[in-house]
Each structure stands twice: as C-alpha cells, then as structure tokens.
Amino acid sequence: MDKDIILYNKYLSNDPQGLKWFENEKISRRSPIIRALIAMTTEPLIPQADNFTPPRRTPWGGTEIIENYKAHLGIASSDVVGESWEISGHPSFPNIFSCDYSGTTLKVPISVLSDLAPNDLYGKYCDSMPFLVKILNSGSWKEYRDLLHDKIAPNVLEKNNHDLHIALSDNNDPTIRDIHTQMLAKNLSVQVHPKKGDFIDKPSKTEAWVILDAEEGAGIYLGLRQGITKEQFEIKMREGKDLTPLLNFIEVTAGDVYFIPAGTLHAIGAGLTLLEPQETSETTFRAYDWGRISNGKPRQLHLDETMTSTIWNGDRSTEQYKKQPHTCHESEGSSIVETLVEEKEFKLTRITLDPSHSEYFGDSVKTGIQGLVITEGDIELHAKNYSRIFKKGQSIMIPAGLGMFSIIGTNSTLLQITA
C-alpha cells in the first residue's frame, strides 16, 4: 500500500498571493493532485522569474537586473534589486513553480517536488539541490562620476574604480566626501565563505562569477596581495580600516569568468552584473562593509569567523582565479559548447547558438538535475510532448526525470550548471 502524504501549509497554495493553503490535508500518493505534482519532475520546470532579495538584505543593488533581464518579461520593481535567485532549493529564497490542476493554478515550492519525487528531480548523484544560481547587480557609479566631473582633475576621474576610491579617500571637501560615501555604498562587502570543516554548523560555499555586464573601470577584489600577512590584515580589520588596499583589484569585462574557492577573501565592486553559481549555502562572513549604514545602522561584521575561514598561505597570484573557456564541442549545425568551470562543487558550461551552430542536445538522466539561464536571445526547448519558447532573463530547471531534450536558437547564449 502506498504511503500517505501529508501536505502542510508550508507547501501548496492555490492563491497567487499565498493566502489560501492546503492545511494538514491528508492525500494519498495515488490521488490526482499527487500524480500531477510528481509528473512535474518529468518536464522542464519554470521558476517564478522575480525571486528577488529585498533591498534591506542587498542594499548595494542596482537597476540592471530589472532593466536588462526582467522588464521584457513583464516584471517591474520600484526597488533596487541586488540578487535574483534563479535556480534555488535554498529555504531562504526557494524556487516556486506553477502547476495547473483542476481549473486552478497551484504555486508549488521546490520542497514539495523534493519530498514527492527526489530521484526524478535530482537524479542518481545527489539527494538534495546540489547548487544555487544567482544573478547579481551592484549599483552604478556613472551618476557619481558625472557629479565629480567639474570637481576633480580629469586624470583622476579616468582611473578605475579602486584607484578612484583611493584618490578620493584623502579629499576633505565635504561635497566630494558625501559623493564618495554614496559611491562606496554600491560595493559589496569584503567577505569570505567558510571551507569544509571550518565550522560544524556552517556549510562551505565555493562559487564562480561570469561577468555579464561591466561599466568601464569596474572590477572585483580577489585574494590578498603579495606580501600582506595575516597579522597585518587582522590589525586593520579589527581597527575597522579600509581593507581593499590589502586585496588584489581586477578590472573585468563582459565574458570574464572567475572561480572563487571557499576561504578566498573577495568583494564585488560597483557597476557589475554577473551570474554566480555556487554551492547551496548562504554562509557569508563580512570583514569590512565600507562604512555602510543600512536601515539606520551598520551591518554586522564577522571578524573571528573571517580569521578562521580565510586561506592565509599559498598562491597569491590573480591568474589562479581566472578561468579560460575550453571548447568541448563545435560542429556544423550544432551549438558551440564551452566548459567555463569544472570543479568538484559544480560544472559551468556556456552554450552559444548562432545561425551556423543552432541546436544543442542534452540528457538530464546522464547529468542529474541541470540549471539553464538564458543571458542572450530567445531559445526553443523541445522534449517529449513538450515545446516552448524562452526569452533572455528566464531560467529553467531541468529535472533528471526529463531525459533527452534539445534547444534551438540563432543568436542566443545560455549558461548551464550541473553537479
């Protein structure tokens, strides 16, 4: 006899606002609603496209996620958006899918599918969501550079973001200091994520960045500079001093790919939009937050945890972080497939479709669950008894139970994440 399933109110809503819930309703696995839910894991899963973090959580956010990736999908927001959790099984911002059932639309969190059909959802290689994929956008410096145009020397204004920050740090003009403070609030904090084994109750977090858009002069901070000691860093950190002169600053352009192992000090600078695949974890330790005041007070710092988690020894070169795409498949009529990152935590692949390379074939039985994020153009996705067009800014979760599928496009790019 099939085991009964109990759907608690944390699971299903048949109201778009989430106000009407199935409460403690005991439903047999053989019931039509359960069969409909399980059947979802044999088709592409389309997450709600507005899975955004609120400004209080990501106060450094900008407008690019809405303007460049979501507005044409009918999504608007009056708030800045720092993060869009595109492929997520994390309880903080889980993906929610729609299921048409008996004349209504159910809003189905990924946790329901994970409970009902974990093998069809994840595949044979894992029993929970193995990765998390976000689009991040840090606020722009363009308006501040315009404000500074007649206030500082042109050769200073032409500097990259980090060098401009350093140049402005010694300026005592009240107007310039106020502009500088606003500029710094567009950077993400200097932070680190723990390695496996650093803490019993805090999972590791290794991640990668694919730069989607970058303002001129924008960049990232990655790793300690040559010659900086653990003791020097700790003294400045505990004094609340600016830590960025101790880190490598790297100017970036669209298309660049970086791999950030857990334990690496880093920060995302202003003026960037990037895709971030990572381990399913949100453990972040802040070492420095630019003097930011958010919701009326400074955000919490994690100084002891930073000291425990950071890798202090080893290679300090920036070349270790940058990944060079490796073309693994290119033939007439087929897509251009490039491996961007292939590590034990996840694999990241870029699929390019153009008039002479217009079709990609995949098999989620072989790979397990996949995440697809469309960063350019439109695509058509085809599978057994399934065909649908997707647009730039949409993401697709490919469950293991789908199996064979194909993607067609002519001027399109998508990023694929697998375990």
Give short role names for the model-derived ranges.
Residues I179, L188, I200-K202, E207-V210, ...:
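His/acidic/aromatic-lined binding-pocket segments of jelly-roll/cupin-type domains
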Residues S358-E359, G377-H382:
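Short beta-strand segments in beta-sandwich/barrel cores
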Residues P174, M183-N187, K195, P203-S204, ...:
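Ligand-binding loop in jelly-roll beta-barrel domains
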Residues D2-T229, G291-K323, L348:
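Transition-metal
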Residues L247-F259, A383-L402:
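Short acidic-glycine-tyrosine-enriched beta hairpin
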Residues F285-K366:
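C-terminal amphipathic alpha-helical segment
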Residues M237-R286:
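Loop-centered beta-sheet repeat module
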Residues I211-I235, V337-T339, L353-G368:
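Short beta-strand/loop turn elements enriched in aromatics
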